[in-house]
Regions:
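N-terminal hydrophobic/helix-forming segments and targeting peptides
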Residues: 1-208
C-alpha cells in the first residue's frame, strides 16, 4: 500500500494530475463517469464518478437494497505550493526569476534549496478549437535559494517571508536561457504561440 501511495504521489505533481489519476483508478474499479450537464440515470448497485474543471472529483456508490444512512469521506486533491503568474519571467541582474504567488497555507521555508519543477494545465489552440492539456516537466528547472547567514543574521529568529522579495524561484542566467514558456511548450508537445492560458504550479522533485 505504501508503494502504491508513493507511486500516486509521484504521478500527481499538480491537482489536475491527481484528479486524472483518481478518475482512472475509479474507472478501473468499475465506476461510471457522469457529466454534470447530462441527465443522470442512477441505478441501484451503481458506482459513479463526477469531475469538475479537472480539479475536483466526487465518487459515490448506490447500495442494492436502499439504505438508512450514508458515509462521506473527503480529502484535498491540491496542496500548498506556488502558482506561476502570467508572463512570469523577471530579469534580476544577470539572472531570470519567475513571478509567483503563494497558493494555500504553506511552511514557506521548506521550499528553499530544493530541486523544483513545474506542472499543471495549459489552455491551447488546437485545430481552431480550445483544448486542455496537462503538463509536467520531468526535470529540475528551478530553485528558491536561501542566503548565507552573514547576509541575513535574523534568519533563525522569528523569520517572516515576503514572496515577492525572498521566494521568487531562480530560473537561470538571463543570457542564452531558453524562454520559460518554450520549455513548457516543448514538454507538452505544443507550440508556445498556441498556449493561450495556463494554471502552472511548482512541485518538489524530492521523492515522496
Amino acid at each position: 500500500m505504501s508503494r502504491d501511495l508513493l507511486h500516486f504521489i509521484a504521478k500527481s505533481p499538480s491537482v489536475f494530475h491527481a484528479v486524472r489519476g483518481v478518475k482512472a483508478a475509479l474507472a478501473y474499479a468499475g465506476f461510471t463517469e457522469l457529466r454534470e450537464e447530462d441527465t443522470w440515470q442512477i441505478e441501484k448497485g451503481g458506482k459513479y464518478v463526477v469531475t469538475r474543471d479537472g480539479s475536483a472529483l466526487v465518487a459515490f456508490a448506490v447500495p442494492e437494497n436502499g439504505g438508512e444512512f450514508f458515509r462521506i469521506a473527503a480529502a484535498h486533491c491540491d496542496s500548498p505550493t506556488f502558482k506561476i503568474k502570467e508572463n512570469p519571467e523577471i530579469k534580476d541582474g544577470p539572472y531570470v526569476r519567475l513571478n509567483v504567488e503563494g497558493y494555500g497555507g504553506m511552511i514557506m521555508s521548506t521550499w528553499m534549496d530544493r530541486p523544483l519543477s513545474v506542472a499543471g494545465r495549459l489552455i491551447t489552440r488546437e485545430n481552431g478549437h480550445l483544448a486542455q492539456k496537462l503538463v509536467a516537466v520531468d526535470g529540475t528547472m528551478l530553485v528558491i535559494p536561501s542566503v548565507a547567514i552573514h547576509m541575513d543574521r535574523q534568519v533563525n529568529q522569528n523569520k517572516s517571508w515576503n514572496v515577492q522579495k525572498d521566494l521568487l524561484p531562480l530560473y537561470g542566467l538571463s543570457s542564452g536561457k531558453t524562454p520559460f514558456m518554450d520549455v513548457i511548450a516543448a514538454s507538452a508537445k505544443v507550440k508556445a504561440e498556441d498556449i493561450l492560458a495556463h494554471d502552472l504550479y511548482l512541485y518538489s522533485r524530492v521523492p515522496g
